[in-house]
Amino acid sequence: MTRWLFMVACLGIACQGAIVRENSPRNLEKSLNVIHEWKYFDYDFGSEERRQAAIQSGEYDHTKNYPFDVDQWRDKTFVTILRYDGVPSTLNVISGKTGKGGRLLKPYPDWSFAEFKDCSKIVSAFKIAIDKFDRLWVLDSGLVNRTVPVCAPKLHVFDLKTSNHLKQIEIPHDIAVNATTGKGGLVSLAVQAIDLANTLVYMADHKGDALIVYQNADDSFHRLTSNTFDYDPRYAKMTIDGESFTLKNGICGMALSPVTNNLYYSPLASHGLYYVNTAPFMKSQFGENNVQYQGSEDILNTQSLAKAVSKNGVLFVGLVGNSAVGCWNEHQSLQRQNLEMVAQNDRTLQMIAGMKIKEELPHFVGSNKPVKDEYMLVLSNRMQKIVNDDFNFDDVNFRILGANVKELIRNTHCVNNNQNDNIQNTNNQNDNNQKNNKKNANNQKNNNQNDN
């Protein structure tokens, strides 16, 4: 399929090396510090008798608990566990207790929400996000074992100050599923909170190739399509630490910029990096003439999943094949020479599935000092072993790592002292790209819909 988006010109050896600055004095292997690590996940069941009963009944199987996202609020570190048979709780916080596999998890807000048989609780928490009003948003796929639909997908909202469950929003079937292919799978979200009553939630459908937008002002949903959401068959095969697997997944990792209101995203099976400005969505404008998708098809040298944007407009992306974190300052043009690798570790960064940037933390687990600068959290889950089902649970398999954002990008391309001027130039360039590609974009979108 011909793609309509402009591509970054890049040839030969210069292209291959553009994502990392040569002769850098930085030790990329030590850029991110390990905060927590696990051989496998276990839970605070309250008693050993309760734990053994869960094992005997099949409620808990330590070989089936795989993490997918992380976030932090005050002294609570949240970890989501994909719901497989043998997973007792999908939304959790890290407790102060330690088991043989690592720190024990504790269901959030309590064990009652771990039960899901009547569909009133959480089936499988894929991604989570905390907004500026201390609300926790949880994307519940409704799937067990990643493929079996048990309940309709939902959004859950919690008040973190009280741990009260504020709202449960069921996502309509015609929104959650591609009407042509019958496929659907919600795996990622980003939250844009203008105020308490005016919040937009963006969700990625990686199987149905769509972006879903929820507006809490009127409880409305919108399903958007673009060929930039589609997976690229050239990049469906991925290799991590010498182990390969295939995933034909479309749009997955997303991150919202607090500077430009750009929503950045990539299909998992691609080397692309794309974005859409959300200003029209904030005005309830969802028509094709209002929405413009931009980016580059082959700007990365590997696949990417997790993403996050700092308060100064630095986009961080997890680089799958490199076991690394890359960065780009959105005040610069989107070209390979402006991307740089800021962390790389073949052992600790095998598939970065979750990534968050926290502006300030009054308390941080692992440190006696408050974090007053922006701080990055990443979760790595060795996805190649999830897909291939070949974990060795005597090894450390899952990690949460962190770093000060300023220190992470110090002396890199991602630091820019003239951001205000450059952001205007970048926006002007983007406007020109939108105008030049508008006609071709509409044609290609129609072709894509016909292909589906």
UniProtKB/Swiss-Prot annotation:
Pfam families: MRJP. The keyword Secreted applies. Disulfide bonds: none annotated. Gene3D superfamilies: TolB, C-terminal domain. Belongs to the major royal jelly protein family. InterPro entries: 6-blade_b-propeller_TolB-like, Royal_jelly/protein_yellow. N-linked core structure contains mannose (which consists of 8-alpha-mannosyl residues, one beta-mannosyl residue, and chitobiose). Residues 1-17 form the signal peptide. The keyword Signal applies. Highly abundant protein component of royal jelly, a substance produced in the hypopharyngeal gland containing proteins, free amino acids, fatty acids, sugars and other nutrients, which is fed to developing larvae by worker nurse bees. Major royal jelly proteins (MRJPs) are high in essential amino acids and probably have a nutritional function in larval food. All larvae are fed some royal jelly (also known as worker jelly) early in their development but it forms the principal source of nutrition for larvae destined to become queen bees. Glycans are attached at N145, N178. This is Major royal jelly protein 2. It comes from the Eukaryota. SUPFAM superfamilies: NHL repeat (SSF101898). The gene is Mrjp2. Keywords: Glycoprotein, Secreted, Signal. It is found in: Secreted. Secreted from the hypopharyngeal glands of the worker honey bee (at protein level); expression peaks at 12 days post eclosion. Expressed in the brains of adult worker bees peaking at 12 days post eclosion (at protein level). Expressed in the spermatheca of adult queen bees (at protein level); Expression levels are higher in mated queens than in virgin queens. GO terms for cellular component: extracellular region. Induction: Moderately down-regulated by the ecdysteroid 20-hydroxyecdysone (ecdysterone or 20E).
